[in-house]
Amino acid sequence: MGPPPTMPGSPKSPKSPRRSGGSPFASSPMLEISPGLILAIVAALAALAVGMLDLTHEVTLGIDLGTTYSVAATCDKGEVSVVVDDITGSMGAVGGDGATVPSVVHFERPAFALARGERWNRPWKTDHTAVVGTTRELKERLREFKSRRDGARSSNDAAVVRVGSTVGAAAAALRDASPALTVYDAKRLIGRTFDDPIVQEELNHLPFHVIENTWPPRPRDAAIGAPLLGVSMPYKRLMPSDRTQVLVIPPEEVGARILSHLKRHSERSLPFFRRNMGFTFGSLTVSVPVGFTKEQRAATLRAANRAGFATARLLEEPVAAAIAYGLHEDDRERTVLVYDLGGGTLDVAVLRLERSSRTFLVLGTAGDPHLGGEDFDRALVGWLRTRLESAGYHLPSDDSARWEEVALRVMERAKRSLSEVERVGVRACGDEDLAEDGDPEPTFSVYELRPLLEDDGSQREDPPGFACTTVWLTRDDLASSCSDLVDRAMSPVSEALHNAGDVDPDEIDDVVIVGGSSRLTVIRRRLSEAFHGRDVHHTVNPDTAIAVGAARSYAC
């Protein structure tokens, strides 16, 4: 019999799918793993293994804690990198730009304060504490506590607060706007006593208060008789007084905040696995001048401890400079002269490389603790002032201090530019002012200064109602206006040779220059002449050489 007839409108019975070879999976798409995917998985596993192995070796950190600029460098498996740009924290090759961080700390207004005599029992998020009070009140309280070594608190005690801060380029940018809240050149004071002649001389140049510590135990770690930095804090809530308050901190606290800033950005610059596994630097090699005393070295170690380093090693700056140039790897005994002209100090050292141990022995040193790039900047500001006044401009009498700060920054940039170009311009603009003493010729108050290169539109029209002029600074102008400073800068060279045992200039095998101010062409020329035309080592960025040597000196 045939199949039953299909009724109209009734559903047709489904047909069985055709199966090839009788396999029920023949028509289903097969799950395939491509070779590219396999290779990607293998590569990822290999990268993970390499990253895990990368955690087994030590990455060293070296920091040049300078008077005006500081630099950090890391050494990973023999490869040294400088931490570049204190804003992004990115890494750069040795000699890269943007590595220097201004040794400047801008203190912020406290978020809270204690009443007099009140204790803060909650745990601190950081251990950055300070003492606050008016200048007069602090001096009275410190005098009172001088005879009370137990440091007991009283109802009239100053307030203890936690104060935030900004470090580096951001702080330097605020130096002109709020100089009373900005601290710099703290390295000149660290580890010294208040009665030290250098401290007393610095009192005339610093915009913040410096008072003697006679009040233990706060600020912590500050020895009795040590200088304390007082930063004006216009924050009336701190005290029941309408007078300006003063934040008091030891100099090593400034160093600690700079070191902490560099530590944080150095950790951000680490490779992916170390950065994301929460790696932190527990040890540090920090450079110090050869002439640092025991107290100054101890204060530097305290600053490193307050910055979060469990251990810190001190390395003398000229030794770090020689290591940066790889002179310690030479198989011969060598006599090296290191010339370090920084922003605030000049240090000259004669070293001898011991062939057997490949270590450097310091034979003699000399220097000038009050000669550096800042002195050249001030001399150039004087040169600029003379040129502007001869052109009919005068300085604003009501805000001369702020104008001086701006001029210093501008002339510093102009000075640095002369290391690469033959001349640089400074554009000054001012508004017309009434003539003084009945002089019918108008004068102009300078309100804008900025460095200017030749291709920077120097011939543009003046703004309406203002007069502008461009003053050109050449290398010869710099040499003539700073001739006395250049002579001072050469004097420690002969003194260091004498202190090293009357070493003859011809006995020097290598002359190494470091420090940002050693870029000055007149300095390099005079050094070469002092050693009978010998070439001066300057292939390593002088700004970063000491930090590179510090990072390379230990387990690298």
Indicate where each model-derived feature is located.
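Short, low-complexity, Lys/Arg-enriched N-terminal segments of secretory-pathway carbohydrate enzymes
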Residues: 1-30
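Cofactor-binding beta-sheet edge motifs in enzyme active sites
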Residues: 263
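Oxyanion-binding/catalytic loops of NTP- or PPi-dependent enzymes
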Residues: 24-201, 212-220, 241-248, 268-556
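Short acidic, low-complexity segments enriched in Ser/Thr/Gly/Pro
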Residues: 206-240
